[in-house]
Amino acid sequence: MTRIITNRIKFLEEKFKPDLIVIGSNTPSLLVEINKKNVIKVLPPIKMAAKISVTGNIAILTTLAAVKSKKLSEFIKKNRLPKRINVKKIDASRLVQLVESAKFIDNENLCNTTVRKVLSAQFSKHNIDVATLSSTHLPFLLPFLKKHFPNVTFLDPAQEIANKVRKIIGKKSSKRNSMKIFTSSNPEKFQNHLWKMGIKKKVNFLN
């Protein structure tokens, strides 16, 4: 993964010369060491979770790779949370798959069933009252998460990342500031998913 991510960053820098690159995924953000001023990682907002938790029990919803990694444990330890805080790492890979397959758009029953199966027992057993959406896919499932767990606060790090971007690049406007979408997978399939979500933008292939 380290080689793939570092090569991709180098490729993007050479091809687009961006002011800033956001690694829009928690798993590589956690697992890959990147020390570049123009690269922003997306990491679990566990300090905020600890701050607002009443029960002292918070969950990190993430991928299996992240759950099993030493890097996530090190990240939790590095944040030096209060002793009253217990952190439960939960494999939400099945929820991520609902988004990657676009099932969250047109298969409500499957989403409801999967959300309950993956999280109900874990949340109940560990008395979770705050959960971080530590896969950037998971915010798309917020309507289902809030429906089944109204007493749990779900934290989406998107606004925090947007604030970091604004702080670094400022509010300057540019003729180049237009959105273009690229994918290294099937552009037609990805574009179809986006269109169902109301995003009418052309998807370009990035080899």
Per-segment meaning from a language model:
Residues 1-207:
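Non-catalytic structural scaffold of enzyme domains
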